[in-house]
Amino acid sequence: MTRQGIVLAGIVVLDIVHLIDHWPSEETLAFIDRTEFAAGGPPHNAGAGLLKLGASFPVTLLATAGDDAYGETMLASARSYGLDTSQVSIIRGAITSHTHVMSCQDTGRRTFFAQLGCNNLMTVEHLMPPAGSNAKLYYLGSPGTARHLDESDGWRVLLKAARERGMKTCLELCPVPADALRKLVPPCLPLCDYFVVNDYEAGSITGIEVAKGGALSWAQAEEACRKLLAMGVGELAGVHHPYGAVAVRRNGEVSRRPSVKVDASEIAGSTGAGDAFYAGMLMGLHDDWPLDRCLDLGNAAAACSLHSPTTSASIRRWDQCLSYAESKGLRPGP
């Protein structure tokens, strides 16, 4: 039987995105232009991105929520994209995890203030790959964000279970402190078939400086991918950066693809750019696209995501993303 679909498991939060005029120093004032509410967290964002891109396969969410207004808003937001939330676990009496995202209009950068809530109560049982599932991929995120899973080797347990149930595995990260990444991620890598990270995460795990002064080093990014494969990643390792992305397959295939040139006037925020990139990669990997095209769709989806301060609202169908990228042109390549 041909496998179809992606199960996305891990931390899901309600993102409360404040678009602010600038980042204030302590004891000074900044103004909020507007506030938007949307479900967030790597599994949700990747799933919403897949559906916005036009994925034709099932996209299922495994996560936790509290029985509160935050949870109701979060799940309604997830369903609005078409995500299957029927397997989200409701934890009675718990606060739904939520994050205040401060997105600066003058820089496009964002800062996060998180209430961990029910994600600190999440266990392996909440995220276990469904028995009998015909899903092709199991995506998990993110080490360093769920206390019980961090302390119990839960991330490895889940990846191992997914493989035993016939799924390919992916692990996505969040910008947690580098020492947490170095502790939690390497033991997971031999259980990951696909592992795609940003320049900060790649540097934290491999010790290779992928970007200097904001500029991507293509050679160093490729070296980081090769080291991740040497650390155990099964089939593909990738590194993405605002200037482009690099991926290396275990069979030796290498792809280096520059990112899309997006005018500063078009950028409303970069909250979901990394997750949008991963969504594009996941769609291509699920559908067995050539590696260059996987990276191109990841870059194009990330570029479109910049048009909204929320994570997924401005992502377009996959063909429209690629057309947008073609119309804007690419940054200088390697």
Predicted regions mapped to residue ranges:
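Ribokinase/PfkB-type carbohydrate-kinase core domain
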Residues: 1-14, 66, 75-90, 102-256, ...
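Phosphate-handling active-site elements
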Residues: 56-60, 253, 284-298
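A gly/proline- and charged-residue-enriched helix-loop-helix capping module
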Residues: 91-95
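Short, small-residue alpha-helix embedded
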Residues: 48-49, 203-206, 267-291, 295
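Short alpha-helix plus adjacent loop in nuclease-associated cores
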Residues: 96-101
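Glycine-rich phosphate/adenosyl-contacting loop at the front of the ribokinase-like
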Residues: 1-80, 122, 266-270, 331-334
